[in-house]
Regions:
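Membrane-water interface at transmembrane helix exits
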Residues: 41, 65, 69-74, 113, ...
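Interfacial segments of alpha-helical transmembrane regions
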Residues: 37-63
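N-terminal transmembrane-helix/juxtamembrane module of multi-pass inner/ER membrane proteins
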Residues: 1-32, 66-94, 170-171
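Small-polar-interrupted transmembrane alpha-helices in polytopic inner-membrane proteins
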Residues: 56-70, 121-133
Length: 171
């Protein structure tokens, strides 16, 4: 079922979308777009606490996803089941579930949204594009994406409501 959905998404393939989604997915590589945004927020006194919370959410989501859940589930990537699909990016060697790009992106996007809707809405839109790019590029199953969304969102909610909400209302 999931491979059928991925194959349907893959049928959207065209040169423009190929370049677009390769560029979008690269923003999520090693969480670089989120780390840069976090540093920018840290450098502004008004947004420093938000930057700390966002980066902490990113760090915890990455740790739980990459170090605990991926080795525990040990799910192979979709391209291993369908080798005739041409992969447009370097083939990831780590396990598939949950999507690290998606988890990191939603950790940051959700945390920003909880703190500041103006910052959060564009961040969630970017997170959604990054998540979709992982399926378009055939490196994640839809449930990997869902797992990343749930993990990143859960970490952000826990951090925000247990630690940061009070600190941010004091500002």
């Amino acid at each position: 079922m999931e491979l059928q959905l991925l194959n349907l998404i893959h049928k959207l393939s065209c040169p423009f979308l190929n370049h677009f989604f390769v560029a979008v997915t690269s923003l999520g590589n090693a969480g670089k777009v989120w780390i840069i945004l976090g540093i920018v927020l840290l450098l502004q006194k008004k947004y420093r606490t938000i930057g700390i919370g966002m980066l902490l959410s990113l760090l915890l989501t990455s740790f739980f996803g990459e170090q605990i859940i991926k080795p525990l589930i040990a799910r192979s990537r979709p391209f291993t089941y369908n080798p005739e699909i041409s992969i447009l990016i370097h083939k990831p060697s780590s396990f598939s579930f949950p999507s690290g790009h998606t988890g990191s992106s939603f950790a940051c996007g959700v945390f920003l949204f909880l703190c500041n809707k103006k910052l959060g809405i564009p961040a969630l839109i970017l997170a959604s594009f990054i998540a979709f790019s992982r399926m378009y590029l055939y490196v994640h199953f839809p449930t990997d994406i869902l797992g990343g969304i749930l993990l990143g969102s859960a970490v952000s909610f826990v951090l925000y409501f247990s630690i940061f909400k009070e600190k941010l209302t004091e500002l």
